[in-house]
Amino acid sequence: MALLRGNSLAISQKMLSVFQASALPHISLRIFISPPSIANIWNSILLAVPKKKTSYTKKRSRLLSGKALKDKTVNRCPICGSFKLAHHLCSHCFRNIRREFNE
């Protein structure tokens, strides 16, 4: 096992030397972070923490609010005048049509 690791290390060093010769010149960029910018980042992290625990009532009201059932649009049937859901067949007219086809 150690022999394989040594061979692979030697092979990888040879390949690295070949690729380094043909690669583009190395450019190093040094970026200096000034201490005030670190302080600003640290303050934003500290300020993101809530000061007090959220109460049970507020938590439950937030979780359960806004989930009411949506209102259904109810229209009058243009044929018989009874109430029906929008984009649905009138149940009264449907029963009449069904009765006629069954006879």
From Swiss-Prot:
PTM description: MRPL32 precursor is processed by the m-AAA protease, which cleaves the N-terminal transit peptide. Cleavage by the m-AAA protease takes place prior to assembly into the large subunit, an essential step for mitochondrial ribosome (mitoribosome) assembly. Proper processing by the m-AAA protease is dependent on the zinc-binding region within the tightly folded C-terminal domain of MRPL32: zinc-dependent folding halts degradation initiated from the N-terminus and triggers the release of mature mrpl32.
Please state the gene responsible for encoding this protein: mrpl32
Q: Which Gene Ontology terms cover its molecular function? A: metal ion binding; structural constituent of ribosome
**GO cellular component terms attached to this protein's record:** mitochondrial large ribosomal subunit; mitochondrion
Chief subcellular location equals mitochondrion
Q: How does it assemble?
A: Component of the mitochondrial large ribosomal subunit (mt-LSU). Mature yeast 74S mitochondrial ribosomes consist of a small (37S) and a large (54S) subunit. The 37S small subunit contains a 15S ribosomal RNA (15S mt-rRNA) and at least 32 different proteins. The 54S large subunit contains a 21S rRNA (21S mt-rRNA) and at least 45 different proteins. bL32m has a zinc binding site.
Q: Which residues bind Zn(2+)?
A: 77, 80, 90, 93
Output the InterPro entries linked to this UniProt entry: Mitoribosomal_protein_bL32 (IPR051991), Ribosomal_bL32 (IPR002677), Ribosomal_zn-bd (IPR011332)
Say which family it is in. Belongs to the bacterial ribosomal protein bL32 family.
The alphabetized UniProt keywords are: Metal-binding, Mitochondrion, Ribonucleoprotein, Ribosomal protein, Transit peptide, Zinc
Organelle targeting sequence: 1-47
User: What exactly does this protein do?
Assistant: Component of the mitochondrial ribosome (mitoribosome), a dedicated translation machinery responsible for the synthesis of mitochondrial genome-encoded proteins, including at least some of the essential transmembrane subunits of the mitochondrial respiratory chain. The mitoribosomes are attached to the mitochondrial inner membrane and translation products are cotranslationally integrated into the membrane.
Between which residues do disulfide bridges form?
Answer: none
What protein name does the entry list? Large ribosomal subunit protein bL32m
UniProt source species: Schizosaccharomyces pombe (strain 972 / ATCC 24843)
Subcellular location(s) per record: Mitochondrion
Q: Which HAMAP family match?
A: Ribosomal_bL32
- On whether Ribosomal protein is a keyword of this UniProt record, the answer is yes
**SUPFAM superfamilies attached here?**
Zn-binding ribosomal proteins
- Please cite one Gene Ontology biological process associated with this protein: mitochondrial translation
The yes or no answer to whether the keyword rRNA-binding is present is: no
